[in-house]
Swiss-Prot record:
Matching Pfam families: ABC_tran
Record's function text: Part of the ABC transporter complex HisPMQJ involved in histidine transport. Shows ATPase activity. Responsible for energy coupling to the transport system.
UniProt keyword Cell inner membrane, yes or no: yes
PANTHER family the UniProt entry points to: AMINO ACID IMPORT ATP-BINDING PROTEIN, HISTIDINE TRANSPORT ATP-BINDING PROTEIN HISP
Subunit description: The HisPMQJ complex is composed of two ATP-binding proteins (HisP), two transmembrane proteins (HisM and HisQ) and a solute-binding protein (HisJ).
Membrane topology: Peripheral membrane protein
Name recorded for this polypeptide: Histidine transport ATP-binding protein HisP
GO annotation, cellular component aspect: plasma membrane
GO MF entries: ABC-type amino acid transporter activity; ATP binding; ATP hydrolysis activity
Catalysis: reaction(s): a polar amino acid(out) + ATP + H2O = a polar amino acid(in) + ADP + phosphate + H(+); L-histidine(out) + ATP + H2O = L-histidine(in) + ADP + phosphate + H(+)
Highest taxon of the lineage: Bacteria
Length: 255
């Protein structure tokens, strides 16, 4: 059984088709990197996976459960059962480019919030879980009472990763998690993500970090103008690209 199956996703904005039949399958422990130029549809695809963007067609299955959908008035798909959507989203934790932490909550409360209010965990258990995952991403206890504005960008993104981990999801989705960081802070976030990959966590990430993608991925997808132009193992995609578009992309992005 796959941890995540996404089949034939289409997304349009008016007459502009951003995604044209993109599919992905992730088994337990897979790390799938999605690469491509800006505007290729990478982030839109990831947001369609957990219905932050509503696709116009396609199927999404997490484990043994397929998201039930119905046609919307504007040609998009809508969740047929909001409770099922919430349940599936809780199994698909997402880490965003711009952290998306709650500015009015402390670090600890940011991580505790969803386990308590979505998973209905006992608060004491949620606090213990939050502290466990904050320690896992290298944030000391003294940080937990601070607010996001008091942290560096790298620290904020590590809090966001701890928040995602606290949901103990089946799959973690990363949407360009380092692109908003100063260059000197990128390494600390990539180190945490590499540790997660080495633990066997199932991850789908959109990234511009080509060396990192080559190192940690089990599978790489090159997206171009809303379609999968090429995919394969890291050695195939980075070492022996078949598509001229992929060769051009790598020539401009490999460091």
């Amino acid at each position: 059984m796959y941890s995540l199956q996404v089949e034939d996703i289409h997304k349009r904005y008016g007459s502009h088709e951003v995604l044209r039949g993109v599919s992905l399958r992730a088994g337990k422990g897979d790390v799938i990197s999605i690469i491509g130029s800006s505007g290729s549809g990478k982030s839109t695809f990831l947001r369609c996976v957990n219905f932050l963007e509503k696709p116009c067609a396609g199927h999404i299955r997490v484990g043994d459960e397929e998201l039930r959908t119905r046609p919307g008035a504007l040609g998009e798909l809508r969740a047929a059962d909001p409770r099922q959507l919430q349940r599936i989203r809780s199994r698909l934790a997402m880490v965003f480019q711009h952290f998306n932490l709650w500015s009015h909550l402390t670090v600890l409360e940011n991580v505790v919030e969803c386990p308590v209010n979505v998973l209905r965990m006992n608060r004491d258990d949620a606090v213990a879980r939050a502290r466990h995952y904050l320690a896992k991403v290298g944030l000391a206890e003294k940080v937990e009472r601070q607010y996001p504005c008091e942290l560096s960008g790298g620290q904020q993104q590590r809090v966001a990763i701890a928040r995602a981990l606290a949901m103990e999801p089946q799959v973690m989705l990363f949407d360009e998690p380092t692109s908003a960081l100063d260059p000197e802070l990128v390494g600390e976030v990539l180190k945490v993500m590499q540790q997660l990959a080495e633990e066997g966590r199932t991850m789908v990430l959109v990234t511009h970090e080509m060396a990192f993608a080559r190192q940690v991925s089990s599978h790489v997808i090159f997206l171009h103008q809303g379609v999968i132009e090429e995919e394969g193992t890291p050695d195939q995609v980075f070492g022996a690209p078949r598509s001229e578009r992929l060769r051009q992309f790598l020539a401009g992005n490999l460091k």
